Amino acid sequence: MRERETVFDRIGEEDQVIAFFPCIRFENQIMLSFRGQAYQMRKWTDVQKMEHDMKLLDELNHMYKLVNKLFIVCIRKKIKLIVENPYSEEHFLRRYWCLQPSVIDKDRRERGDYYKKPTQYWFVNRKPSYNFIFETANDNAIPSRGKDAWKERRKADYELTGAETVKVARSMIHPDYANRFIREFII
């Protein structure tokens, strides 16, 4: 018997949860840290790198348990769930998880977002709608500046997203993209 109420106790089969699950330990750049090849680690000793690896692995394990618990609860309670996370071949969930994404959006600019940002979505207890949207998507893309686009991003570029830093700008979703995604896959 559970000791306390959870947020899931008030969510039922008629509800729908959309989760932007933290990706910091699942995304492909984390592999650079595990190998000790991240730029900020260039002067670290092997011992420092290994100690850091153990911490990263603990954090990865914690996040992996959380995402699994979220899915398990929603599957058992028949709660409709949509989870968003970045997509890449090296992404931890893409490589090692038993669930495959329902939708992979390889270029979000085609649906009106600021950046390409390949993204994967898991749909639980429901299927994507795959509605056909007749109007063309607005071109809200912020111009790329080559291979190291994020390093060369100018303040004027990322301020278009409403963000105050380039780090926050990467997480911003253009309202046109959100609207189009909802109409195409959810409604």
Task: Write out the residue ranges for each language-model feature.
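Conserved active-site and SAM-binding loop architecture
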Residues: 1-187
